Amino acid sequence: MARVEALSIVDALAAELRQRVFSGDLTHSDALTEAEVARTYEVARPTAKAAIEKLVGEGLLQRSAHKTARVLQLGPDDVRDIYRTRAGLESQVLRELARNNVVPADAVAANSEIATLTDGAPLSVVEPDMRFHTSLVDAAGSPRTSRIFRTLVSEVRLCMVQVQGKHLLTTSSIVAEHRQILEALADGDGERAVAVLTGHLSRARERLAAALGSEPEPAAAPPDPA
C-alpha cells in the first residue's frame, strides 16, 4: 500500500483508519497492532501508535494490555446512552437556534441531499444525516459542544456499521422530520423543534437497539409514515 502523504502524517493515518472502521473494513474481530499499521502504511511505529491512540481517544478503538487494538463493540445499553445524550445536547441547541430563528444553510443542504437518496443503500444516508445534525450543533457557535457532538456522531456511525446499515427509519420519514425541525426553527418555535427531534431520535434509538439484540422499549412517538 502506498505511503500516506499529508502535512500531519498522524492525522492522515488516523483518517485512513477511521474510514476503514466506518466502512466496515475493520471490525471487532480484527486485531490492530502498531507493527502491522507501521508496516502497512510504511510509517514509523511511534506514528502508528499515535494514530491508533487518536482513535482510542475518539472511542472507536479499544486497546488491551498487550497493546492490540480492536474496534469498539457497542451494545444496546451503549446505544441508548449515546442517543439520550444526543437528544439532550441537540434539544438545547435547537432552543438556542429558535430564539433567533436560525436555519443553518448547511442543514438545509444536507437534508436536500438525503431526499435524493431514496433508492440508496442505508449507509449512504448516514453521512448526510449526520451532517444535518452536526450543522445544527455547529450553528450554536460553541466549539466545545461541537467537539462533544462529533464524538457522539462517531459512535453512532460505529453502531450503524455493526448492524450493517439496516433501514432504521425510512428515508422519506427522515427528510420529513428534518424539514419539520427546520420549519420550527424558522418559526422560532424551539419546543416544537425539540418535540420532533425527540420522536425522531427515540425511534432510531430503539430500532438500533433492537437490531443489536435488545427488546425495544415502549415507543412514545408515532410510527413512520408509509
Q: Which residue ranges define each predicted feature?
A:
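Alpha-helix N-cap/helix-start motif at coil-to-helix transitions, marked by capping-box chemistry
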Residues: 7-11, 83-87, 101, 108, ...
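A short secondary-structure junction motif
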Residues: 20, 24, 152, 156-159, ...
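C-terminal regulatory/effector modules of DNA-binding transcriptional regulators
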Residues: 167-226
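A ubiquitous short alpha-helical element
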Residues: 76-79, 94, 98-99, 116-120, ...
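Mobile beta-alpha loop/short-helix "lid" or hinge segments that flank ligand
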Residues: 57, 61-62, 150-155, 170-172
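Conserved amphipathic alpha-helical segments that form helical-bundle/coiled-coil interaction surfaces
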Residues: 104-162, 175-184, 192-202
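Short linear motifs at protein or domain termini
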Residues: 1-102, 209-226
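Short, solvent-exposed amphipathic helices
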Residues: 84-89, 128, 151, 200-203, ...
